[in-house]
């Protein structure tokens, strides 16, 4: 009996480990902060990125003798912007009298309509 429960526990633990390993890893997007211009300190940079930039973390990077503060964001939280929908097709405007004549099946002066049964002759 104890052997069955140990086997069941090991199997359950194995399934749990496999389920966790299948989850997608978090991808981070990095961006240089424009507001932090002091000598780069890891703790200050991280604090600035978390409070002012709403980032997950921050770190310092030296590029061509210039110290940069880089903020790291969780890419999965920010969906890419969707393009704007195309503009609607242009509206066709008709003269009120022409449209009314078509609706009422009445001929306008100079208009020839062979299907008009109620038209004056």
From Swiss-Prot:
Keyword Mitochondrion recorded: no
One GO-annotated biological process of the protein: cell wall organization
InterPro entries xrefs: Scorpion_toxin-like_sf (IPR036574)
UniProt superkingdom: Eukaryota
Task performed by this protein: Anther-specific cell wall protein which could contribute to the cell wall architecture of epidermal anther cells via intermolecular disulfide bridges.
Keywords noted in UniProt: Cell wall, Cell wall biogenesis/degradation, Glycoprotein, Secreted, Signal
Disulfide bonds listed in the record: none
Span of the signal peptide: 1-21
Organism: Helianthus annuus (Common sunflower)
Compartments (UniProt record): Secreted, Cell wall
Gene Ontology CC annotations of this record: extracellular region
Name of this protein: Anther-specific protein SF2
Keyword Secreted assigned: yes
Primary localization: secreted
Glycosylated residue positions: 115
Free-text tissue specificity from the UniProt record: Epidermal anther cells.
């Amino acid at each position: 009996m104890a052997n069955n429960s140990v086997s069941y526990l090991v199997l359950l633990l194995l399934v749990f480990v496999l389920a966790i390993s299948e989850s997608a890893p978090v991808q981070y997007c990095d961006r240089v902060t424009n507001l932090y211009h002091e000598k780069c300190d890891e703790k200050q940079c991280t604090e600035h990125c978390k409070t002012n930039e709403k980032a997950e973390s921050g770190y310092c990077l030296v590029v061509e003798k210039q110290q940069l503060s880089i903020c790291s964001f969780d890419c999965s939280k920010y969906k890419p912007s969707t393009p704007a929908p195309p503009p609607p097709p242009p509206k066709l405007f008709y003269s009120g009298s022409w449209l009314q004549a078509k609706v009422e099946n009445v001929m306008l002066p100079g208009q020839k309509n062979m299907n008009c049964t109620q038209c004056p002759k």
